[in-house]
Amino acid sequence: GGLSLLGGIILLSLAAHTFSIQTMIEKVSDIQNSPFFILAMVLVMIGAFTKSAQVPFYIWLPDAMEAPTPVSAYLHSATMVKAGLYLIARMTPIFAISEGWVWTITLVGLVTLFWASLNATKQQDLKGILAFSTVSQLGMIMSMLGIGAVSYHYNGTDSQVYVAGFIAAIFHLINHATFKGALFMITGGVDHSTGCLLYTSPSPRDQRG
């Protein structure tokens, strides 16, 4: 993921002759007419999907739940998993002209949302439940960014869809960081008090209600 992102940024810099994202946006026509455009777009998406744990690159995030509680809270709520989402939001003015960008981001986000939600219901470890719920929320935000980018194809960047999609995505990004960090700290309190994080109810459905 990191190497893909590095490759994408290098290709963008070759097309725009700068490493500044703001300047790249100002030179968006040069980038879109560059032979590097498609490859750069694919590499940036791969980098973003791995950083924000999208399907099929999500497995590292549930594994990270084994870390100490403060580390888990940071990984699952702060900059670590939000970096890919921020990258997609910043790069949308450059790549949204491509339908491939819009459809890929939207569909990957939706698949991640439903796949991770389903897996969360199968977990018995409290941290596992929270980890997969984090993946599903990241998928929701990713799909919001994709839906917001649809406006580039019919009414420009000032359309209500674009504004609503991106405001919703950024709001939920901040909202998710707040409640998920708190939930992981609460889970740490449960672990400290009981010495166990396994949910052992006779009826697994109790944890889903």
Where would I find each of the regions flagged by the language model?
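N-terminal low-complexity segments that are often proline-rich with Ser/Thr-Pro
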Residues: Q207-G209
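...captures the hydrophobic TM-helix bundle architecture rather than a specific catalytic motif
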Residues: G1-R205
